[in-house]
Curated annotation (Swiss-Prot):
Protein name: Pantothenate synthetase
NCBIfam families documented for this protein: panC
This protein's GO CC annotations: cytosol
Pathway(s) the chain acts in: Cofactor biosynthesis; (R)-pantothenate biosynthesis; (R)-pantothenate from (R)-pantoate and beta-alanine: step 1/1
Pfam families: Pantoate_ligase
Species of provenance: Rhodococcus jostii (strain RHA1)
Subcellular location: Cytoplasm
SUPFAM superfamilies: Nucleotidylyl transferase
CDD domains registered for this protein in UniProt: PanC
Gene Ontology biological-process annotations: pantothenate biosynthetic process
Amino acid sequence: MSDLQGGYKRGELTVHHDPSVLTRVSKALRGVGRQVALVPTMGALHTGHLELVRQAKLTGAVVIVSIFVNPLQFGAGEDLDAYPRTLDADLELLREAGVELAFVPTAATMYPAGPRTTIHPGPLGAELEGVSRPTHFAGMLTVVAKLLQIAAPNVAYFGEKDYQQLTLIRQMVTDLNFDVRIFGVPTVREHDGLALSSRNRYLDEAQRSAATALSAALIAGAHAAAGGAEAILATAREVLASVPEVEVDYLEVRGVDLGPAPERGDGRLLVAAKVGTTRLIDNVGVAVGTGFLERDAEPPSDASAADELLSR
């Protein structure tokens, strides 16, 4: 228990900056039988992040939220310097949510020798988002791998909005034998369907209105799923084409593992587009050729989802 001295206080938020200290605290908690859950973020927290926290807390775990704007996952011309940083407000939100541990490192503490060792994402990392952001996923997987090592959690939570990211993290955890469960949480949306994102704050009123075309297109495509992948895409394209402010990068139907779309079965419809200078992504599950998502037949309650995690 000595490793918990000053590093963890039940019911209070303790903020850690030193990776080695957080590792000691997490392992000490696990050593006395506590579950530890990690919610990695880049800050600028919103309701979507807090839903990840809520899901993590359902299991009774001690929740660690990391806040780190990772320079490795920003490419040339991307918005590293402009990315919103709202640490004081973020920590207050975590206190209100009942989070007990926050990890707020710097680039110097995360990469003391520079980014000399990185994780290669494999072929999937060069597709979809990887076409326009060729270095993004290597940077993302590298920081996630480090956070999993540092926080030493039983389970880590990621949003389904970044579906390719979630898929690659699951791939990495499987391929590299990480001893951690990865739990995907459904996308949280505004009342008008816009997926919550820290980048939404870059949109002016007109752009924000135009951006709702992404979710509208996805929903329309999902409703056309009984006609197969081509019907899904044709329907979604029609919606996007009706809003000229939306500059589409890609719109694709894939399998749930982001392999080729099935002729019949569960898949994923993914879109990326620019609205003004802001790049947005979104996705939904689609029942290709059937119009009925198998996984949505009986949505689990919060309690059953928590029970499922604890039983694994």
